[in-house]
């Protein structure tokens, strides 16, 4: 299987966890997009009933228009049964780096509230330790971004403000904030680093998702591999 086939395979495998009367948290990214498409097809064919998706606000309108998945906002639900999302890195203890799509704050809120959090990745996202390949996205208040860059130097991080593609200026999140991408030498204690980064004044949230994933479905050339905490 090539990478796209791996993504499709894990997206289909995640459908096995869907049952009637579920509220499903939905993230962003290309692999999650396949899952959302397949979930919409299941609903359309009547294979499951009374399914509602809860995506980050920036995705709500697009989901209603494109997928056929009924959508609710986070404040309209009392609980989320399952959340399904991708990741940029997954370490051996199922800690994650997420946030290349700049929706990390709302994704973390949704996934923290979920009864079960299922992560969909291809095998290239598996790493020996976090920050092996990808930086940690950090959502920051715009007025504080320069001060936070200086603060991150204490951690020996190579950090930079994420700039927009096909637009002038920095990337702006759905919350009106900026994103700093911080590449640390390595992260040996993800939970401690996640907490410590969030204590920096001006940081809204960061892309370390420690001790939150329950199941990781990994697309490999041989098929889908299931990892559990």
Curated annotation (Swiss-Prot):
Top-rank taxon: Archaea
Enzyme class label: isomerase
Molecular function GO labels: ribose-5-phosphate isomerase activity
Sorted UniProt keywords: Isomerase
GO biological process, one term: pentose-phosphate shunt, non-oxidative branch
Function recorded in the entry: Catalyzes the reversible conversion of ribose-5-phosphate to ribulose 5-phosphate.
Protein name (database record): Ribose-5-phosphate isomerase A
Native source organism of the sequence: Pyrococcus furiosus (strain ATCC 43587 / DSM 3638 / JCM 8422 / Vc1)
